[in-house]
């Protein structure tokens, strides 16, 4: 099956008045499902990190193509394109002239990524890899991360580790936490609560 997904956005509009505002399409993509494999083309969401995407989270943050495969307890995805809103908020644009700050800005540069997650029964394991494909030293980045979730009855213990191998200095980030409950947006009244400690180096943070 093939689906087209789009979302319109606009400035503040009062439908009872005579004011006007610009309307735009902030997310638009086409997805085709081949069964265990599906392909997505266009502008789609991207999430990096647990806790809802602490490293990076945008429902329209990537322009490109993705191939994903579902093997039951193991899922993998690879993609190519460009971030359109990924910026490390610790830096100004002039900082990119300093090789020590490479990786600070990753938007609008060709990017390859690969993601995988596995349900191993006693725990869930996942890994992510993102790399810049333009070979520009001042904008180069090479980010990888691994994470673990261990369910214990209604509780869960989780943690992550990330590193930007091209950054000098504070190039990594990690967290550990505990959660309770299971939120399901299709079931009113369900909820979840997570508490975590995050240690984030400036070289790996993307403004999530």
Feature names for model-found ranges:
Residues 94-97, 159, 193:
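Intrinsic disorder/low-complexity signal
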Residues 132-134, 163-167, 201-202:
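Short, catalytically relevant binding-site loops at active-site mouths
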Residues 141-180:
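Oxyanion-binding "anion nests"
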Residues 129, 159-163, 197-199:
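Active-site proximal loops enriched in glycine and acidic residues that flank catalytic Cys/His/Asp
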Residues 1-92, 110-126, 171-207:
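Outer membrane beta-barrel
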Residues 20-26, 57, 126-151:
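Short secondary-structure boundary segments
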Residues 93-140:
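Loop-centered beta-sheet repeat module
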């Amino acid at each position: 099956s093939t689906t087209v997904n789009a979302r319109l956005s606009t400035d503040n509009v009062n439908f009872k008045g005579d004011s006007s505002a610009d309307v735009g399409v902030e997310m638009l993509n086409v997805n085709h499902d081949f069964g265990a494999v599906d392909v997505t083309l266009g502008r789609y969401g991207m999430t990096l990190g647990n806790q809802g995407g602490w490293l990076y989270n945008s429902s329209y943050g990537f322009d490109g193509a993705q191939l994903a495969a579902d093997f039951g307890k193991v899922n993998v995805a690879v993609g190519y394109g460009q971030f359109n809103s990924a910026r490390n908020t610790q830096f100004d644009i002039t900082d990119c002239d300093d090789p020590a700050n490479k990786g600070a800005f990753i938007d609008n540069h060709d990017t390859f990524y690969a993601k995988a997650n596995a349900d191993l029964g006693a725990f869930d394991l996942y890994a992510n890899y993102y790399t810049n494909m333009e070979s520009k030293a001042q904008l180069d980045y090479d980010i990888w991360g691994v994470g673990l979730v261990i369910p214990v009855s209604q509780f869960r213990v989780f943690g992550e580790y990330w590193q930007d191998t091209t950054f000098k200095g504070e190039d990594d980030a990690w967290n550990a936490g505990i959660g309770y409950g299971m939120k399901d947006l299709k079931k009113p009244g369900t909820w979840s609560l997570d508490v975590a400690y995050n240690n984030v180096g400036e070289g790996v943070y993307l403004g999530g």
